[in-house]
Regions:
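Terminal, regulation- and interaction-focused segments at domain boundaries
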Residues: 30-79, 138, 158-245
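Bacterial N-terminal signal peptides that target proteins for export
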Residues: 2-13
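Ser/Thr-rich, low-complexity intrinsically disordered terminal regions
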Residues: 49-53, 57-104, 108-109, 129-132, ...
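Sec/Tat signal peptide C-region and signal peptidase I cleavage site
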Residues: 24-30
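Bacterial N-terminal signal peptides
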Residues: 11-22
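C-terminal partner/receptor-binding element of secreted or periplasmic proteins
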Residues: 130-172, 313-342
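Intrinsically disordered, low-complexity acidic regions enriched in Pro/Ser/Thr
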Residues: 32-34, 46, 294, 333-341
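Acidic/His-rich structured neighborhood in mature extracellular/periplasmic domains
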Residues: 103-140, 145
């Protein structure tokens, strides 16, 4: 995706309702408070799954956002006849807000929404910027940007009108810092969880964007290789601000993650066939390419830490039982990145 867009809408009640609840009357907007990792935006939408996806896509475009990823999400094979669909969006103004905190803040992009089915109907959710941006960008300094992102999500789902809801789920957090599980597993400041997967001289392929295009092409060619079959989903060209992003995903990875998390801490969903589809907005994973010190660096988030960011409510025992999954995902991505660039 090489297009840039010009319109950004700031409005809607949810962002300010959440911030008001966190800060109280007479208080300036702050990012303090307890927030869930996910926002449920639409509940029991009418018209069937495909129509909901179409309406969501059209809602994003009408609200002035560009769709950069639009794909069917992998679901568990066992006893799951339901579907999930991912849509990722960006706007020029929100990109500018995020990248004003530096190129590595790009891990907060793009905004991701998921359409998912369960026994109760078809729903729409998104990852919650009020929660995740505290982890990725700043504990306190991006409150207004996060509020504007939530307001934009409400604008995007405005076509669903009376089916809109304002609820949070996933791990409830009162701070951005994600601590170690059992004192050992994947915790700490976000900056320390950004890893370099590869670096090449900036002139090797002709600059930042050309390097990203070379990488994307190589990842496409290798999409069917290795166990997880990780594949690229989008290329987001922000090279005028020193960043290019590539989204990576895998149907097998998505299905496995949803099967592990299941209902999380929501006991009301524990009897559903595949409750983990509610977490569809967790993917794709992000590769961030930046130009630093004459090199193009390919950055990713430590895979175990990223799983904790989006699936921590699966619980300690499930993380302990599936310790091999994140390293195997990251290992495959690293191998494919190296094969594409070296």
């Amino acid at each position: 995706m090489h297009a840039r867009i010009t319109r950004f809408l700031l409005g809607g009640l949810l962002a300010f309702a959440l911030l008001w609840a966190a800060t109280g009357p007479g208080t300036a907007i702050a990012q303090e408070g307890e927030y869930g990792v996910y926002l449920k935006l639409v509940e029991n939408a009418p018209g069937g799954f495909d129509q909901v996806v179409t309406t969501l896509r059209e809602g994003a475009e009408a609200a002035g956002w560009t769709v950069v990823a639009d794909y069917e999400v992998g679901v568990p094979d066992k006893n799951c006849s339901y579907r999930a669909h991912g849509i990722a969006v960006v706007s020029d103004e929100y990109v500018d807000q995020v990248l004003s905190h530096g190129p590595r803040a790009a891990f907060a992009l793009p905004l991701r929404l998921g359409v998912f089915e369960d026994e109760a109907g078809v729903h729409v959710a998104a990852f919650n910027p009020l929660s995740l941006n505290r982890t990725i960008i700043s504990e306190t300094e991006f409150a207004e940007g996060s509020a504007s992102a939530v307001a934009a999500l409400q604008e995007i789902v405005a076509p669903f009108e009376e089916f809109q809801v304002e609820s949070q789920y996933g791990q409830m957090r009162d701070e951005g810092l994600i601590k170690k599980t059992m004192g050992l597993i994947a915790g700490g400041a976000f900056d320390g969880k950004i890893e370099e997967a590869a670096s090449v001289d900036v002139d090797e392929y002709g600059g930042l964007l050309a390097t990203a295009e070379q990488l994307y092409s190589g990842l496409e060619d290798a999409a069917g290789d290795y166990d997880w079959k990780m594949r690229p989903m989008y290329l987001l060209d922000l090279s005028d601000q020193g960043v290019v992003m590539i989204g990576m995903t895998s149907g097998a990875m998505e299905a496995k993650a949803f099967d592990i998390v299941k209902e999380g801490t929501d006991e009301a969903r524990e009897d559903f066939a595949c409750p983990g589809l509610a977490y569809a907005a967790a993917f794709p994973l992000e590769l961030v390419l930046v130009e630093e010190d004459g090199e193009v660096r390919v950055l990713l988030i430590d895979a175990m830490f990223r799983m904790k960011m989006f699936f921590e409510d699966a619980g300690k025992m499930k993380f302990a039982a599936n310790m091999k999954m994140p390293p195997s995902l990251e290992g495959e991505m690293r191998d494919k990145i190296e094969d594409s660039l070296y």
